[in-house]
Regions:
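Amphipathic alpha-helical repeat scaffolds of TPR domains
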Residues: 2-27, 51-73, 98-114, 140-152
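Extended ligand-binding groove/face enriched in aromatic
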Residues: 101, 122, 136
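Alpha-helical repeat scaffolds
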Residues: 36-49, 75-94, 118-132, 158-160
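Acidic, proline/glycine-rich low-complexity IDRs
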Residues: 128-160
Length: 160
């Protein structure tokens, strides 16, 4: 049996693969797309009722679930309710989670769902604290992800 952290890491890896499918110029095959969507969805469903043993593990779990549900196209009808439940858990965590990369990642994961400018502003405040040094790979990735979300708010855009 895998540890909760191993399952979280696995969900993150598969979600990342699904979200970046085809961005490398390789063709997207429908069977691989379906397989990744199914895998991400089932992993999210498996982990949905879980809770981290520590504040950090719970934050990592919420990030993984929000990312996974965001990545998959599957919705048997209760996906929005589950996303809202994870958002509620995340907002409770943000009340106690210290300023850190993990907090920034959770803020951005929540922002990706609701596009609340206060979440983005708080993430930017954390990022601004990194300006006087070279960014780690993870910091660079979260900066780029937030930038991409702010530039492409498709789910919150109205089509004329």
């Amino acid at each position: 049996m895998l540890s909760l952290q191993s399952e979280i890491d696995s969900l993150c890896a598969v979600s990342h693969e699904l979200l970046h499918l085809g961005l490398d110029g390789e063709p997207i095959y429908s069977d691989r797309f379906r397989q990744l969507n199914t895998d991400v969805y089932h992993r999210c469903e498996h982990l949905f009722g879980s809770h981290g043993r520590t504040l950090e593990e719970e934050a990592s779990l919420c990030i993984a679930l929000l990312t996974g549900y965001n990545a998959t196209i599957y919705n048997p009808g209760d996906k929005e309710v589950k996303i809202q439940s994870v958002l509620n858990r995340s907002l409770d965590l943000l009340d106690t989670l210290p300023v850190s990369l993990l907090r920034c990642r959770l803020l951005v994961a929540c922002y990706a769902e609701v596009f609340d400018e206060e979440l983005a502003a708080e993430a930017h405040a954390i990022i601004d604290g990194w300006k006087d040094r070279e960014l780690t790979r993870e910091e660079f990735e979260i900066v780029e992800h937030l930038k991409s979300l702010e530039e492409n708010q498709y789910p919150c855009s109205e089509v004329d």
